[in-house]
């Protein structure tokens, strides 16, 4: 599981600037769940081989008792509860304040790992302004400049150091055993717990023992018709004796971590509410993570024909970027349409791990170019020479040639469609990378 870092501090100390600095490698804000998370923004960051989730919070006043400030305090407390480590951001130029003392007292009581970041510290590394923050009793103050990126890398190293991050081999071990890691993702009250409880209650679904490989989250190993699965918790799974039961408990962090840990994600929508912004955010994160995906529309029995037509159009437009995903209409409560989900989940998993031989890929590429060559861009016409597979889960096809930086997105989609058809790739993203050969005459021409 990715570790979670929460950025905490009073208003206007530079938390959002630091958040954007930490997450810029993954397009800053990944999920801003309007209404649900209010002043908590969730993003992905990466440093070296380590990836992490960052939570950006609103200004924190632990003792706020009214209006928006109370809500901001509640949201920040929730972010701290979700986090593995807290980065307490203070304003070095603004100096120590009573609010800083209040926040420090709150964090000390929690006993959670905490790193003190002195922001806006450009040119002040040895300044007496830093010394006063030792009064907070949280150890050394680490000077950073979020705006200029100074000290940010070492700050992340300090934050991640006490977490004893798990090695990546855990995922590889599960893959070798042909265990499909499955996550059911969706916003609150779409029926995740109902669907999971229906699955866990099936006679054909037999639990088996497998050592837990994820930190903090609950996962349930089971077997169905000879295929082993590992259900990753996104719905508040709780053990009752020897039985697992799901309760509808939404956690953004748990959802993002489950998606990252899964081989296949079942995206659950609510037919009675259509495709919401939250649905689109979750769907976008699934695509960004490169996970195989199956879409299921729950409560299908609760809408009339007109509502169904409207919903289908909404899915086509708002989730057009997942058009490769199998689409199912179900009623978890009435157990309607649930059976066919399993074949789509297995098909998506197999597609994500499909091996594509280089000779076949190159032949398909040449046939595609012969049928429709890429358009010229000014003086340059892209020339494609050969293709090979660059990865699996998701599958990646690398195309080599000349002037490939001028290949249009429309032509890439044209190629994608032909590759998908040949290899029967259903339910998985397909990434196409263009690699232009270096021109040995360029330097001579420019000299």
From Swiss-Prot:
Function of the protein: GTPase that plays an essential role in the late steps of ribosome biogenesis.
GO MF annotations in UniProt: GTP binding; ribosome binding
Domain of life per record: Bacteria
Name of this protein: GTPase Der
Disulphide bond pairs: none
Gene: der
Binding residues annotated for GTP 1, in chain numbering: 9-16, 56-60, 119-122
Membrane-spanning parts: none
Domain (KH-like) ranges: 354-438
Signal peptide location: none
Natural source organism: Acidovorax ebreus (strain TPSY) (Diaphorobacter sp. (strain TPSY))
């Amino acid at each position: 599981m990715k570790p979670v870092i929460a950025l905490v501090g009073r208003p206007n100390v530079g938390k959002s600037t630091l958040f954007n600095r930490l997450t810029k490698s993954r397009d800053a804000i990944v999920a801003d769940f309007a209404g649900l998370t209010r002043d908590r923004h969730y993003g992905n960051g990466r440093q070296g081989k380590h990836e992490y989730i960052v939570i950006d919070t609103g200004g924190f006043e632990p003792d706020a008792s009214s209006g928006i400030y109370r809500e901001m305090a509640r949201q920040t407390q929730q972010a701290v509860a979700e986090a593995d480590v807290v980065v307490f951001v203070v304003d070095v130029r603004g100096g120590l304040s009573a609010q800083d003392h209040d926040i420090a007292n709150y964090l000390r009581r929690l006993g959670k790992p905490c790193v003190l970041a002195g922001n806006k510290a450009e040119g002040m590394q040895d300044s007496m302004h830093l010394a006063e923050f030792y009064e907070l009793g949280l150890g050394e103050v680490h000077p950073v400049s979020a705006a200029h990126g100074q000290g940010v890398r070492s700050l992340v190293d300090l934050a991640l150091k006490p977490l004893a991050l798990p090695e990546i081999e855990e995922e590889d071990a599960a893959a070798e055993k042909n265990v499909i890691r499955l996550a059911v993702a969706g916003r609150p009250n779409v029926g995740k717990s109902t669907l999971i409880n229906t699955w866990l209650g099936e006679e054909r679904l037999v639990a088996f023992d497998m050592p837990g490989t994820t930190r903090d989250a609950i996962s349930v190993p089971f077997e169905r018709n000879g295929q082993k699965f590992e259900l990753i918790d996104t719905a508040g799974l709780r053990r009752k004796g020897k039985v697992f039961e799901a309760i509808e408990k939404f956690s953004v962090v748990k959802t993002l971590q489950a998606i990252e840990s899964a081989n296949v994600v079942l995206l659950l929508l609510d037919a009675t509410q259509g495709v919401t912004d939250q649905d689109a955010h979750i769907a976008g994160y699934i695509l960004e993570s490169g996970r195989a995906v199956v879409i299921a529309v729950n409560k299908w029995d609760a809408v009339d024909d007109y509502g169904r037509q409207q919903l289908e159009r909404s899915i086509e437009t708002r989730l057009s970027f997942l058009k490769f995903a199998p689409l199912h209409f179900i009623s978890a409560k009435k157990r309607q349409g649930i059976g066919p989900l399993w074949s789509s989940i297995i098909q998506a998993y197999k597609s994500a791990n499909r091996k594509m031989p280089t000779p076949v890929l190159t032949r398909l590429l040449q046939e595609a170019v012969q049928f429709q060559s890429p358009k010229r861009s000014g003086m340059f016409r892209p020339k494609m020479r050969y293709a090979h597979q660059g990865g699996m889960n998701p599958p990646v096809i690398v195309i080599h040639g000349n002037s490939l930086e001028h290949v249009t997105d429309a032509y890439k989609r044209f190629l994608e469609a032909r590759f998908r058809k040949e290899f029967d790739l259903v339910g998985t993203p397909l990434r196409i990378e263009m690699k232009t050969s270096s021109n040995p005459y360029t330097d001579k021409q420019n000299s």
